[in-house]
Structures are given as C-alpha cells and as structure tokens.
Amino acid sequence: MIRGIGIDIVEVNRISDMVDKWGERFLNKVYTPYEVNYCKFKSNTYECLAGRFAAKEAFVKMLGTGFKHIYFKDIEVRSDEKGKPYLRIKGNADRLTKESGIKRIHLSISHERKFAIAFVVGEEG
C-alpha cells in the first residue's frame, strides 16, 4: 500500500548558479561525496546534480515533513549497476521513514537541458 508520494521539479540553471556562486560550500552542504563524484564525471553534470536535488525535495514531500530535522546529506541518491537511481537514507530521514511505516522507496528521475524532475513513492510492508 502506498504511504506517500512526492514530486519536485528544478531548473538546472538554479543549481549551476548555486555551484558557480558558492562552489564547494554548496556542494558539501547538499550532496554526499558519492553524489558529487558521480555527477562530476557525467557530460551533463548540472543536470545530474539538479536531478539529485529534485529527488531529495521529492523525498521530504513524500514523507510530509519538509526538511524539518532532516539534512540534505541524510538523503543520498545512488545508482545501481544498470544506472537505476535509488535512495539511501540515514539519520532523522531514516527514523521518520520507519516511523511512517514505509518499507520501500521508489525513485524516478528525469532531466533535460533546462529542467530536472523526480518522483518518489513510499510503500509500506
């Protein structure tokens, strides 16, 4: 049974502007080293980062909590061997997920030159 859904769309330029303005400070606040490294070697680095930002926003919308007591880096977007994205969560994000009865999290990310979008579904049992 579905316990929550979340969706978010991000302008790629918003992320590239933040990286240009704040550099490592922004990257280190929002992304894990894995995420930065993964996106750094992509030809579409900013689209990749924007997709991960959208996924984090969609996740907290799915939980219904927003970022209250959750850090961006508590939500990590990883990719399996086929490139399919999935979430690795920790800290308060993990605790709140468990308290909500969510056992499985599904993630889809799409991006193009101007926008990135992410959709998250939380499922019980």
Swiss-Prot record:
Its EC number is 2.7.8.7. One of its GO terms (cellular component) is cytoplasm. Mg(2+) binds at residues 8, 57. GO terms for molecular function: holo-[acyl-carrier-protein] synthase activity; magnesium ion binding. Keywords: Cytoplasm, Fatty acid biosynthesis, Fatty acid metabolism, Lipid biosynthesis, Lipid metabolism, Magnesium, Metal-binding, Transferase. The keyword Ligase does not apply. Pfam families: ACPS (PF01648). GO terms for biological process: fatty acid biosynthetic process. SUPFAM superfamilies: 4'-phosphopantetheinyl transferase. It is found in: Cytoplasm. It catalyses: apo-[ACP] + CoA = holo-[ACP] + adenosine 3',5'-bisphosphate + H(+). InterPro entries: 4-PPantetheinyl_Trfase_dom, 4-PPantetheinyl_Trfase_dom_sf, ACPS, Ppantetheine-prot_Trfase_dom. It comes from the Bacteria. Its cofactor is Mg(2+). Its main location: cytoplasm. Belongs to the P-Pant transferase superfamily. AcpS family. Transfers the 4'-phosphopantetheine moiety from coenzyme A to a Ser of acyl-carrier-protein. NCBIfam families: acpS, pantethn_trn. This is Holo-[acyl-carrier-protein] synthase. It comes from Halothermothrix orenii (strain H 168 / OCM 544 / DSM 9562).
